Amino acid sequence: MAKINLVRIDSRLIHGQVITKWLKMSGANRIIIVDDELAKDDFMSIIYTTAAPKDVSVEILSVEDAKKGWMENELGNGNLLILFKDIKTCYELKNEGVNIENIQIGGLP
């Protein structure tokens, strides 16, 4: 069972502040981005995956895949930083039963 260390809503997803401050502060060793559009975009997925430090794994999941991962084994192992591009997606996943207790709001359009 993974431990959700930080849930952040930020339209920029992985960027300097997330990597230099929030990743270290949260102690996460895995980043999960939940976004239906990004999960279908191989090129942008590579961009976001390579933006993280080499010792941090990045997974990009659709809402449905994140829900399945939570129901099957609570998203596996490790300490998680879960990123959402918008409030709607975070709300949708919480309503599907994912244990989101606290949410940090970052840059939104």
Stretch-by-stretch model annotation:
Residues V63-E72:
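N-terminal active-site wall of soluble small-molecule enzyme domains
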Residues G78-D86:
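A polyampholytic, Gly/Pro-enriched intrinsically disordered region
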Residues G16, K67, C90-Y91:
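Short, well-ordered alpha-helical microsegments
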Residues K3-L6, S11-M25, R30, L38-K40, ...:
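N-terminal intrinsically disordered, cationic/polar leader segments
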Residues F43, W70, Y91-K94:
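Short glycine-/acidic-enriched loop or helix-start segments at secondary-structure transitions
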